[in-house]
UniProtKB/Swiss-Prot annotation:
Feature: compositional bias, Polar residues: 1830-1840, 1860-1869
Domain Protein kinase as annotated: residue spans: 1-435, 1446-1893
DNA-binding residue intervals: 1216-1294
Main location: nucleus
Composition bias type Basic and acidic residues, residue spans: 995-1004, 1139-1148, 1254-1270
Name of protein: Transcription initiation factor TFIID subunit 1
Positions with biased composition (Pro residues): 156-165, 1659-1668
Protein source organism: Homo sapiens
Biased composition (Acidic residues): 1709-1723, 1741-1756, 1846-1857
One GO biological process term: midbrain development
Cross-link (Glycyl lysine isopeptide (Lys-Gly) (interchain with G-Cter in SUMO2)): 570, 583
Region described as Histone acetyltransferase (HAT): 538-997
A GO molecular-function annotation: protein kinase activity
Subunit and interaction comment: Component of the TFIID basal transcription factor complex, composed of TATA-box-binding protein TBP, and a number of TBP-associated factors (TAFs), including TAF1, TAF2, TAF3, TAF4, TAF5, TAF6, TAF7, TAF8, TAF9, TAF10, TAF11, TAF12 and TAF13. Interacts with TAF7; the interaction is direct. TAF1, when part of the TFIID complex, interacts with C-terminus of TP53. (Microbial infection) Interacts with SV40 Large T antigen.
Amino acid sequence: MGPGCDLLLRTAATITAAAIMSDTDSDEDSAGGGPFSLAGFLFGNINGAGQLEGESVLDDECKKHLAGLGALGLGSLITELTANEELTGTDGALVNDEGWVRSTEDAVDYSDINEVAEDESRRYQQTMGSLQPLCHSDYDEDDYDADCEDIDCKLMPPPPPPPGPMKKDKDQDSITGVSENGEGIILPSIIAPSSLASEKVDFSSSSDSESEMGPQEATQAESEDGKLTLPLAGIMQHDATKLLPSVTELFPEFRPGKVLRFLRLFGPGKNVPSVWRSARRKRKKKHRELIQEEQIQEVECSVESEVSQKSLWNYDYAPPPPPEQCLSDDEITMMAPVESKFSQSTGDIDKVTDTKPRVAEWRYGPARLWYDMLGVPEDGSGFDYGFKLRKTEHEPVIKSRMIEEFRKLEENNGTDLLADENFLMVTQLHWEDDIIWDGEDVKHKGTKPQRASLAGWLPSSMTRNAMAYNVQQGFAATLDDDKPWYSIFPIDNEDLVYGRWEDNIIWDAQAMPRLLEPPVLTLDPNDENLILEIPDEKEEATSNSPSKESKKESSLKKSRILLGKTGVIKEEPQQNMSQPEVKDPWNLSNDEYYYPKQQGLRGTFGGNIIQHSIPAVELRQPFFPTHMGPIKLRQFHRPPLKKYSFGALSQPGPHSVQPLLKHIKKKAKMREQERQASGGGEMFFMRTPQDLTGKDGDLILAEYSEENGPLMMQVGMATKIKNYYKRKPGKDPGAPDCKYGETVYCHTSPFLGSLHPGQLLQAFENNLFRAPIYLHKMPETDFLIIRTRQGYYIRELVDIFVVGQQCPLFEVPGPNSKRANTHIRDFLQVFIYRLFWKSKDRPRRIRMEDIKKAFPSHSESSIRKRLKLCADFKRTGMDSNWWVLKSDFRLPTEEEIRAMVSPEQCCAYYSMIAAEQRLKDAGYGEKSFFAPEEENEEDFQMKIDDEVRTAPWNTTRAFIAAMKGKCLLEVTGVADPTGCGEGFSYVKIPNKPTQQKDDKEPQPVKKTVTGTDADLRRLSLKNAKQLLRKFGVPEEEIKKLSRWEVIDVVRTMSTEQARSGEGPMSKFARGSRFSVAEHQERYKEECQRIFDLQNKVLSSTEVLSTDTDSSSAEDSDFEEMGKNIENMLQNKKTSSQLSREREEQERKELQRMLLAAGSAASGNNHRDDDTASVTSLNSSATGRCLKIYRTFRDEEGKEYVRCETVRKPAVIDAYVRIRTTKDEEFIRKFALFDEQHREEMRKERRRIQEQLRRLKRNQEKEKLKGPPEKKPKKMKERPDLKLKCGACGAIGHMRTNKFCPLYYQTNAPPSNPVAMTEEQEEELEKTVIHNDNEELIKVEGTKIVLGKQLIESADEVRRKSLVLKFPKQQLPPKKKRRVGTTVHCDYLNRPHKSIHRRRTDPMVTLSSILESIINDMRDLPNTYPFHTPVNAKVVKDYYKIITRPMDLQTLRENVRKRLYPSREEFREHLELIVKNSATYNGPKHSLTQISQSMLDLCDEKLKEKEDKLARLEKAINPLLDDDDQVAFSFILDNIVTQKMMAVPDSWPFHHPVNKKFVPDYYKVIVNPMDLETIRKNISKHKYQSRESFLDDVNLILANSVKYNGPESQYTKTAQEIVNVCYQTLTEYDEHLTQLEKDICTAKEAALEEAELESLDPMTPGPYTPQPPDLYDTNTSLSMSRDASVFQDESNMSVLDIPSATPEKQVTQEGEDGDGDLADEEEGTVQQPQASVLYEDLLMSEGEDDEEDAGSDEEGDNPFSAIQLSESGSDSDVGSGGIRPKQPRMLQENTRMDMENEESMMSYEGDGGEASHGLEDSNISYGSYEEPDPKSNTQDTSFSSIGGYEVSEEEEDEEEEEQRSGPSVLSQVHLSEDEEDSEDFHSIAGDSDLDSDE
């Protein structure tokens, strides 16, 4: 059998297949002409052998076909009908020695039975379905399928494989020669003995040659089982069958037991004899006789497999899966316990192992792990892969049988199909005809071009010589071509060609001729298919014309060699190193490995894997901010200390400083223990933000020498310290030891300059930059203070490094570049993914607000665009207003998220935005930031400003490009961070040398040399050689040169000497431009100079003094002079005028600063007078300040004094030191300029004069050009003209602009007039007309056409000019309420809150509280079994025992559905969880205890919030309210809405009658009434009894009778409404009676209280009203308004009245008379009549009706819920806050009075806020919240009702009324545009709201 697949698939057999063998036998036996051929029954009688009787019925050919028909599945019936016990026995049991079938005792004769055969299709399908997938093996191509039926194939059938044979396991056992006693399970290389050993299973798969059997197996099958696959073998004698070929030989495509494929069996050319096959066989046969006879089976097996591979038919089967795609069962079996079989090794093996070395070569190779797991000893003794040696007693029989079978196959080879060689291209093409034996034969023929290129040059008419052939083929004509050559033939595998690999083929693992030894892995370094290392990338040398350059190179080669020898120029051998050179075959020196390599950008010597801390890699928030504002960006390189708002350090006072020595040692010990516990070695400790603290570990300080480094690491990022060392030539002592870092030996320097031999340079190196560092000694007096919120810590500092200039390795993206935008996008996406990962909900969800908070600069649309990729926005349901993760979206893993954005990308982005902010602060617009395109970059670099050129996106880009060799760096220039030439300027310059303007080189005279004696063409050869002798060139070298080579050397050497300033023959010098090589050399020298200088300066330990530094004032003087000149040219002013203006401006600025400083210090300033008039100003607040008074003399001789303020401490110290220690003479000398300074001044003056000349020249050019074209600039200026100053009234600036003349006069009143002036109107007309180009006025004859825009603009100007504007200061002072003078009440002040805030539904507030309690319970430990409903599949009997299940998720859903209006219902359901757990688990179970702890936590939380929850429950259900009036009104309102309005066809009575539709209604009906009006009265608490309520209800019926008549349908409906009302009142009679009594009692108590308060003595004033009659209906309103005055003076506490509880009283205050609250807001009282008349005048028509109508549209039942404010706190009602009680009156009279005057007035002005509280009392009632923050009363907020919210329009109207007060239409007209403006205020006075703005 096929040993390859045998090895591979026996693993699967041991695991899966042994127990599930098919019950049915395979059809192979019968189909192949076995003893039982059931197909024979169709054509005649069957003899005892199971074959057809007689020879006359069918001829031999038909019988052959008949034997093949067994493949139709008929053969499987025999085994079931006759031999059930075959499953346990072997096939050989039924076969006699001659191959005939024996009859058994229980055999039954079926010949006479005429029955319909049962349908066997199911069994056949089952058998077909049990085919195994194919498997290719590395060892052999003959495979066999086991006939077992895999369960997995039933569950999910694989793609249909090509049909393969199915054999019974019994056959395989006999074939493989396994003994019957159950010993022979065949194992692969490492496989454990399986428990399935009782059934011997041999599992194999099939390749394309499924039907072929190995020769060894074929012979065994014939000898042991007697089963032959020959046609009609069953009716022949055994000896006769040997002479016949088998059916598989005649028809290789035949499959025993399968459906016949005739096109495959009898295809065209199937039986054509193969010409070459017999010859091949004979050769092999001769060869085989010489070798061992065991190899016969190998060769024959390969031959048969090759035959079987021939197929002209293509099938649509799935391809056989390669072995790597099959399940690796070796792993499973290898992990199983292994029973060692090494003890079974024979003596032969021991003899072999004795000769081996002690340790086997293969034992510790790549497979060491597996050998260790199998327990293989070191010497490898006893290891046999589980193979077994061949049994010796059977060998002669097997050999003879194999030889016999092989001879038989050899004799019958003529009938076989074509061999495999016939399908090779070499046998199909007539390639012999194309061989050119003689070139003369094809000289006149044309060759095919594709073959000609392969054949090489052949002489022909077209290509007579090799050169012509090369030109035709496009080859380079030169012989010294540098391109590498490759062989067209693949490299031979020596093992395949010369090795005995066929000896290692495993034909039978159970019968091995010898045991194989594991091979030793060897890699051939010469194998081109092996990639042993990553090859270096070679940059292609781009050149336009290589051929020209090569010509120049060859022609100049000699002169170059000579010049190189004389030292004029240097030969650069490494320039030609980039291209591979043809190596001299005799040069064995390997010089190319010793050449210095070109240094690339990332010269990472040694490993450079940087492992950042986990918080940095995860981009956690504080370390990697998502947004940085301008202030943070300005402080990016120098972050200030954070001010703590809480914690110990937020308070002033002494704070202790803790040492850290013990903490450091303790932490080090802990980390060492952790390292040891993990097995020692390196360990990564930076895992949490706490690990990043400086309170433990080793610390070093690194001070960056650059002010604004191009790249800065964020907190938590790592860097390496590398110690670069360059060895000395010869004997090197090695690198000196360093305390920090790893030593790296480098030949080429990773910096711009190279290291000297023996030099060591330390460097920071990470993925962002490489920078040299220089260790300095830390002064002993220095230490480190670590500040946290809790306190200070101190620790020692050991070392400090100075960091040199960075060499960027990471490019900073430019603003708005694609890389920057991509980073922003990915950063946002990563943030969103992490938010989803943090979400605890399922499905995961997040809110948009969380993202907008982190990314405030992002638009919502861009965030939404990122979110839509992974989430959906839910508008309804439980997840409303959440973004929920899509169900089909897979969140990226942490590794994938980290790969999206790296910390280095963030750092580069931060560097970019910080630099962008610096440029914006410097005044550069965004257009100057854009990074240029590649092509224009060098030109662009020359044009942009120096500041932009130094931006990090330009410097990093330039440095990286320079390191790649694309350009050079400027080295010295504007981008030098030191500013003094000690650093590199990273600005691009081209590789080619350019003439610098400021080059100090001696320039040759620019004159033509043609025809002069300097013309080199006229120089004779003799004179030229003479010149060379003068230059010192040896004579023998001169003789070697031709004429023009001599001239070339003369020119070069003359140029060199002329450039160095010497040499008499400078006339022959040509060109001052350096060559590229010289330019590169100069560049390297300059880089080296600066590099050495930087190393010297930064490593210097010399202490520099700052005292001797000169002041920078002189430089600023020069700048001022330059600015003055420019201003003089622009403004045509003299220098004296300019200086005066500037001094005046400085004086004003200084004055303003002093005023500001004085006001800020508020009296803390103290003045220290000094003899030198040095004043320290404001030293306590703003630091020291030096004021220097200088005396000047103007042109007229008058003296004046100016004060100069200096704030720099260093300048102050220097000035004071000089003043106090030196005399006047020294100071006078000090002030005089020295010689050097005068020289600098002269240079500066010359520069400024040159600038002046240039400006004049430009002006003259402009004059010559003529007047410039006019450009429409008005379009740009128009937006500015729309601005109007609020201070001075001018147009074009705002009041905050410094150009405003009133900018510094902050307290001066604005000077805007009452109406617009004519000038302002004209300015306004200019701004209003927008389009200048459009013709606004057209004249057509006598007709003038005015544009529509003109008329509209005129109307607008007219309307705006009529608007009166009143400044705040000119308004009459508003009346403020009296404030208590006691200081101790300051803490009662509350922040200002708007009156008309939106009210929150109390159900929402209650639900949010309950949900927070659920969250707290869910966070308790071990509560997860109660989080979700019990799974019925897991706990099957739960729902049989528990009838009312409950869990936290269901509880949360109920809360969100607003199903719990009170605490009791919520707690009841929670208690249900405890009861259910006790019922199912038992009361003592741990789960029951956990649920009880949840209930206890809930009770605790409910107790904490008891007051708030009680208020919310009362608001939800007013019947729970302590105020009886609220409950009474609630019942009445329910009667109206749920009963009376529910009467059918009652809609005409729901709202007032519309006057438009029924014009005469209000003439007939004097007192109209409807259900809506009744509801308003209810909401205003106008009904204290049922009688008053019924009066209004009956009035509806009476009005209907009066207007419609008693018989009208409307009247009947009204009667039904009244009946329903009476009926419902009867139902609630008992409850309503009790409420009426309580209301009456409370009313009487209030009246008594009012009488007591009215007796309080009070001095009457001019505005103090006399207390009117309480029962007078006309004065009741004013009494209610004025009564609060008495109450204000009384200072009575609410607690003084025993008749009501505090809660009741506070709510009663809200329901008291209409005027109480209004007057409480007002604080002062007016005359009652005056107030009514005044407000009557200011009444706007229908205002109250509109408010009432608008307010009632939004909810049917205003009492269904009382809403509290969103915060939910609202200052508890029952807290006993001191609030004055207000008097009570007869409510009915008051309310009737209010009702009568409703159409006449509304309360506005100062009492406006209260009036809305009263008139819209259906919106808000209860306790009132006052807006005045200075109020000493503790108040509660209004609550709205039943999910009822004030509409936004009403809010705006009410706020506008309160802000602007009453508006008298006859006097003031407010324009539509400016009604909302803050400049407009009421005439009567500002409201309280305005005073707080």
